Amino acid sequence: MDTEKIESLVYQLLEALGEDPNRQGLVETPKRVAQMMAEVYEGIQYTNAEIAEMYGKTFEVDTNQMVVVKDITCFSHCEHHMALMYDMSISIGYIPKGRV
């Protein structure tokens, strides 16, 4: 991710909005926004397979009982507007097929 380019573009955006990016209170804003975007969009650099491998903490089981995982924090951004669209907690249940 090109955080320097993001900083430059945020600086230009502030100018386009009629703000003075050099005024006190905004001087560090381009850098802060670039850092925030690097954190929020970090996942786009990985494939689904790579993410599954990172969290590959599964083990074999011999059961047909439902597994429930509660209160999973989930958020997502709209790719068209780059705005936070979902910020929620979810719960899932599944019947394992040999692995949990």
Predicted segments, located by residue:
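Active-site loop/lid in soluble adenylation, ligation, and acyl-transfer enzymes
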Residues: 1-87
